[in-house]
Structures are given as C-alpha cells and as structure tokens.
Amino acid sequence: MNVLPCSINTLKGLYDISGVEVGQHFYWQIGGFQVHAQVLITSWVVIAILLGSATIAVRNPQTIPTDGQNFFEYVLEFIRDLSKTQIGEEYGPWVPFIGTMFLFIFVSNWSGALLPRKIIQLPHGELAAPTNDINTTVALALPTSMAYFYAGFTKKGLSYFGKYIQPTPILLPINILEDFTKPLSLSFRLFGNILADELVVVVLVSLVPSVVPIPVMFLGLFTSGIQALIFATLAAAYIGESMEGHH
C-alpha cells in the first residue's frame, strides 16, 4: 500500500542529491581575470568578523578582564603556546603569522557550516567555506612555504641551503622535493577535508532534512577546528625546523 509513496520520496531524495552543485562557481570578471565571487564574498565576511572582533577586544581593555576580554586573551595565549612549542624561544615574531593563519582558517571552516547557504542568491553555485576551494588553500600554503624559507635564510644565511645535502649529497633531489611537497600537502589536506565535510552534510540534508544531519554538522564543526589547528601547527613546525636545522 505504501510502496508507491516511499518510492516517490526515494526518487525525490535522489533527485535532490543529483542537484547538488560540485565545482560550480559564480565568476566576477576583474580586468583580464576571472575570480570566484562566492569565495571572495565569504572571505570578506570572515575578514570582517575577525577585524570586528579584534577591534572590540582592544577597544577598552580592563585591568580586571571581562568575559569577552578573557576569551580573547585565552585565544592569544593558546596561539602563543602553540608557536612557542613548535618554534622554540624565538617564536615571538611569528605569533602574528601563525595566529592569522589559525584564526582565518578556523572562522572560514566554520562559516561553511554556520552561514546560511542561501543568504545571498547567486546565479551559479552557493556560498560556502572559502577553504573548500583549492585556490584559497594554495594561497594559504604558499605564504607558509615562503615563511619557513625566510626564517631559515635569515637565521643561517647561505648555510641554510646546506641542509639539502645532509646527511649525504645523494639525498639532494629528495630533500628538495620534500620542501616542494609541504605546501601541496597543506593545501590538499585542508581542501579535501572541508570539501568532503560540506558535501556529506548537503547529501544528508537532501535525503533526511530533519534530525539526522545535525550530529554530522556538529562533527563537521569539530573537524573544521581540528583542521585549522593542524594547519597552524604544521606551519609553525616547518618554521621551527628551518631555524633549527634539518632532521
């Protein structure tokens, strides 16, 4: 008796899944370049949130911290401890860089789950986390690579490049390849995890739009935070390694 309605509902769910857009982008033409508009829009929202939060945090500091000031001080202390653990005693100049990377990635990852996707109607695609676009993750990984090259070169000068022939010159190609694979691993790890998380949530919402996707969304928020921590930890570890020597 209920076979037909169930079949119709199943087909409707499959149809909704087939409508999930993967790799669809809304482009802006800027000069001779095409840029992903939805990535820029969400990135601007993330930057506005971070700048607004930072402004509020330093606007009226109290000797006895309020709840909000306590929170921001805890975040700063967490980033400082992370940088010191991975870089060592010379961590100070790198705290702003590591903190910026961590906070931008953290808020970007969460924006994909917390910002309503349909809040702004786009001709193509939907609003999503900036970090589910490979262009964003590569743009985050490349400054990290330049940072650890800069850290090693400023600390050791030309002798920094001696690490490529340690412990034996035979390993020169492998040591060079290792440095080139670091930004690749950083960018593809972050991109793959965030994209997969958002696709899983979209598919589950299409199939069972009520209760089932909620635990997956909470799991996605947790893993999004972990991915930001992993990226920042590895960035700090690479900088610390370049300053200490090849291991």
Swiss-Prot record:
Q: What membrane topology was assigned to this protein in its record?
A: Multi-pass membrane protein
InterPro entries found in the cross-reference section = ATP_syn_F0_a_bact/chloroplast, ATP_synth_F0_asu, ATP_synth_F0_asu_AS, F0_ATP_A_sf
Any one GO molecular function term:
proton-transporting ATP synthase activity, rotational mechanism
Tell me which CDD domains the record gives.
Answer: ATP-synt_Fo_a_6 (cd00310)
SUPFAM superfamilies according to UniProt: F1F0 ATP synthase subunit A
Give Gene Ontology CC terms.
Answer: chloroplast thylakoid membrane; plasma membrane; proton-transporting ATP synthase complex
Q: Which domain of life is it from?
A: Eukaryota
Q: Where in the cell is it found?
A: Plastid, Chloroplast thylakoid membrane
Alphabetically list the UniProt keywords: ATP synthesis, CF(0), Chloroplast, Hydrogen ion transport, Ion transport, Membrane, Plastid, Thylakoid, Transmembrane, Transmembrane helix, Transport
Give me the disulphide-bonded residues. Answer: none
TM regions (residue ranges): 38-58, 95-115, 134-154, 199-219, 220-240
Query: Pfam families of this UniProt entry?
Result: ATP-synt_A (PF00119)
- Is Manganese among this UniProt entry's keywords? no
State whether it acts alone or in a complex, and with which partners, per the record. F-type ATPases have 2 components, CF(1) - the catalytic core - and CF(0) - the membrane proton channel. CF(1) has five subunits: alpha(3), beta(3), gamma(1), delta(1), epsilon(1). CF(0) has four main subunits: a, b, b' and c.
Family the UniProt entry places it in:
Belongs to the ATPase A chain family.
Q: What is this protein for, i.e. what is its function?
A: Key component of the proton channel; it plays a direct role in the translocation of protons across the membrane.
| Name this polypeptide is given | ATP synthase subunit a, chloroplastic
The species this protein was found in: Liriodendron tulipifera (Tuliptree)
